[in-house]
Regions:
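Catalytic cores of soluble metabolic enzymes centered on carboxylation/carboxyl-transfer
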Residues: 2-122, 212
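Conserved beta-strand residues within beta-sheet cores
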Residues: 24, 104-106, 144, 162, ...
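Short strand-coil-strand connectors
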Residues: 99-103, 117-119, 139-141, 157-161, ...
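Conserved nucleotide-binding/hydrolysis modules and their immediate coupling elements
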Residues: 108-133, 137-144, 151-152
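Short aromatic-glycine-enriched beta-strand elements
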Residues: 133, 153-154, 214-217
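Catalytic P-loop NTP-binding/switch module of NTPases
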Residues: 142, 148-193
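Structured functional modules or segments
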Residues: 183-231
């Protein structure tokens, strides 16, 4: 029953709202839950630092790398069919470097086989660019994976965790080492408002000492008043 529930959660799509689908899936997979050794302190005991995704095995990450490489190849094949392109009709790259879970895998895609790091991946998969869910048949077992496109690959969600896969053609991947990493700006000294509005009150002045939780300003947003506090 737990396995069927996990499979159902993998297929459930909910976007735009916060949800606990991954957390419920992780609990269903937890050995302690499956053995029935539960107490009212289960969540606090097993997730004392909060939940950031279910643990993922190396085998599953390797499988996801293969899926991501296949998806990237399908996307490239779709792109080459756009009308009005200049030059020769090129085949999509067959070799891809897929970085996922902190490791890089070499994925070789062909009509006859799918290789990950030189090893055959026994998988059956159908995908049309734009699909938000794929169901892969792996050694006779189904694995449902939710998809969302990123600038350099895909976000893959399954078995209670989301993974970002960066997919680059093998002849392009070495150049990624020369890309300058973009460091996010330090916004710790700024007061951020969730949406545009009209400032109706400011409770502090230049040079004032402020503490966490202290009200700093009031903003009017669509006829609602929002108090901004120091986080």
């Amino acid at each position: 029953a737990a396995d069927k529930q996990i499979a159902a959660l993998d297929r459930f799509e909910l976007e735009g709202l916060g949800h606990n689908i991954d957390f419920v899936s992780a609990i269903m997979q937890h050995p302690r839950f499956r053995s029935g050794e539960l107490t009212t302190g289960f969540i606090a005991e097993e997730y004392p630092d909060g939940f950031s995704g279910a643990a993922t095995s190396d085998d599953l990450l390797r499988t996801l790398a293969g899926i991501a490489g296949f998806l990237a190849c399908a996307q490239a094949d779709r792109a080459r069919q756009v009308d009005g392109q200049l030059g020769d009709d090129l085949d999509p790259p067959a070799e891809w470097h897929v970085r996922i879970g902190g490791a890089t895998h070499l994925v070789d895609v062909s009509e006859e086989d799918l290789l990950v790091d030189g090893e055959h991946l026994n998988i059956g998969l159908e995908y049309t660019p734009g699909d938000r869910l794929v169901v892969a048949d792996i050694d006779g077992k189904e694995l449902a994976v939710k998809l969302s496109k990123t600038r350099t690959g895909f976000k893959l969600t399954t078995r209670g965790a989301s993974h970002t896969a960066i997919c680059l053609p093998a002849h392009v991947a070495p150049l990624a080492a020369y890309m300058i990493e973009k460091v996010p700006p330090d916004l710790s000294r700024f007061l951020l408002c969730p949406m545009p509005g009209l400032v109706t009150a400011i409770h502090v002045g230049a040079g004032d000492k402020v503490e966490a939780g202290q009200p700093l300003a009031v903003v009017e947003l669509l006829f609602a008043r929002l108090g901004l506090r120091l986080g």
